[in-house]
Amino acid sequence: MKRTTYAGLVDEKYLNQTVTLSGWVQKRRDFGDLIFVDLRDREGIVQLTFNATHAEALAVAENMRNEYVISVTGQVVRREASQINNKIHSGQIEIDVIEAEILATSKTPPFYIEDNVNANEELKLQYRYLDLRRPEMQKNLRIRSKIMSSAMHFMDQNDFINIETPILAKSTPEGARDYLVPSRIFPGSFYALPQSPQLFKQLLMGSGFDRYFQIARAFRDEDLRGDRQPEFTQMDVETSFMSADEIRELVNAWVKAMMSDVVNFDLDTTKIPTLTWQESMDRFGTDKPDLRIAYELKDVSETVKSSEFGVFAKAVEAGGVVKAIAVPGGAENYSRKDIDKMAQYIERFGAKGLAWLKVTDEGISGPIAKFFPNHAALLQVTGAKPGDLLLFGAGRNDIVAATLDYLRRQTAKDLNLIDMTNPWAFAWIVDWPLFEYSEDFDRWIAAHHPFTMPNEEDLHYLDDGEDPHQAHAQSYDLVLNGYELGSGSIRIHRMDIQEKMLKALGFTPEAAHEAFGFLLEGMTFGFPPMGGIALGLDRLAMLLAGQENIREVIAFPKNSRATEPMTQAPTRVDHKQVNDLGLFVSDVE
């Protein structure tokens, strides 16, 4: 039987027509001489009816079970009024089946194929091909596909050239650990899977292509969390002779087109705010703020530095800060026990406690209220009103920022204070520090990557005798709803500046040329001013699909241990293959 349409597309327009459908049995209800079967395919569900009028088809239906693959031919008829289901597209009609065939049988699945299924995450990953049958997963991956199609169309319309860059590349010290691939032909030598196409796309600009685009796979051997995977996909762009402002305007137009194509949302890009990195950190405690949350961090250091509360006074005296958030309605909704739980959680950020006050019609209450008999100034600075809960952070600026950023996001989630009238809150974060200190590496590293151009007025900081860590960069991040969606910058195109940048990062001239000699030499042949950005496809798909984990928008993802339960990768390989690579693998318990 040749399929004529999808099950989920059949509706009243097909009344009295004969159709042939194929798909999976979602549910079967047997009433003897009348059997109902819900047929599911990628477009949705339609109800099939089998009755004694077509005895052969009824006999086939008697053997059908959940997840059997079937094909049917029948007439589209209107459902009885009591059978109408307005929750599905085909809910007004059903198929009176004339002919039926079972194409494949199925074992009983380890979990039911439906949305909101109560199944262990590892089990769903182990049987990912079953999990992907769920309507929600089908929707998620189609959203991902739409994003890719929209991006490629936009780039084609704007004269970008789609160029693929190597997957087997040279290992370069760009930040995260590389995934290494041993060479059989050159024993002891390794390729690296690229963490990004960064160097290749700069070389393409040096080659004169002017506008490059690629949907690129990238790989990083790093610890995982909900919005990260060891392999990921980015929509990668590089341009020549464009300023940072021009690149951001281009990306705004690109994102506007994608939002329209994928979720039918008319994004007003004129309302996308641009914040400096410092402003974002001061107001929100993070470089990826969720602007749907109205309340912000308020610096109360000057107000409390002379208070009798020693924790605050000592923090300011030691060069730290005291900041607060006023959580609307928090006074009534958080008990002391709730606040104690928050205090325990924020210890992971380095916080040594959580000071708080509840604002009432009479004034303030709480364990530190007695230290602020004249609290009017405190309420004025924080903007707190009766019913609000004031949460404080005191100490080192970075610890206070991380603590209050978490508390701001968590309280907004707890109390439904996220403004859903603004469902897509984009923002640009600009003027980043050129360097940042890494606790992991115990040294200064590039805040974005080593090829980011400093601000023009900060170039002198790279000279000998200057402090390079004072420099800021011509870099920009696009943020959406508290997630970093994309990161970009103007690149260094002159060898003298690039060498100074690498020196500031601790590279000797020999080490710089060992790692990046091909790029440095290329710059001696005249590279144009260039800049670009990479948008994370996985993260964008996650947000547009309304998911909280990027695994839900990747067909075959890894789990939090970077393993893939379905194929059980990574696995040991044949001993001969290892020998051919000139490697020795020690036994590891």
From Swiss-Prot:
GO cellular component terms listed in the entry, alphabetical order: cytoplasm
A GO term (biological process) for this protein? aspartyl-tRNA aminoacylation
Reactions mediated catalytically: tRNA(Asp) + L-aspartate + ATP = L-aspartyl-tRNA(Asp) + AMP + diphosphate
For L-aspartate, which residues are the binding ones? 174, 220, 448, 491
Q: Which residues bind ATP?
A: 220-222, 229, 484, 536-539
- Kindly list the GO molecular function terms attached to this UniProt entry: aspartate-tRNA ligase activity; ATP binding; catalytic activity, acting on a protein; nucleic acid binding; transferase activity
| Cell compartments where the protein resides | Cytoplasm
Gene3D superfamilies the UniProt entry points to: Bira Bifunctional Protein, Domain 2, GAD-like domain, Nucleic acid-binding proteins
- Cysteine pairs forming cystine bridges in this chain are none
- Spans traversing the lipid bilayer: none
Instruction: List keywords of the entry alphabetically.
Output: Aminoacyl-tRNA synthetase, ATP-binding, Cytoplasm, Ligase, Nucleotide-binding, Protein biosynthesis
Mainly localized where?
cytoplasm
Q: Which Pfam families match?
A: GAD, tRNA-synt_2, tRNA_anti-codon
Establish whether keyword Protein biosynthesis is in the entry.
Answer: yes
Where is the stretch described as Aspartate?
198-201
Q: What is its EC number?
A: 6.1.1.12
Any keyword Cytoplasm?
A: yes
**Cited function:** Catalyzes the attachment of L-aspartate to tRNA(Asp) in a two-step reaction: L-aspartate is first activated by ATP to form Asp-AMP and then transferred to the acceptor end of tRNA(Asp).
Tell me its family.
Belongs to the class-II aminoacyl-tRNA synthetase family. Type 1 subfamily.
The record's note on quaternary structure and interaction partners says:
Homodimer.
Protein name, please? Answer: Aspartate--tRNA ligase
Please give the organism.
Leuconostoc citreum (strain KM20)
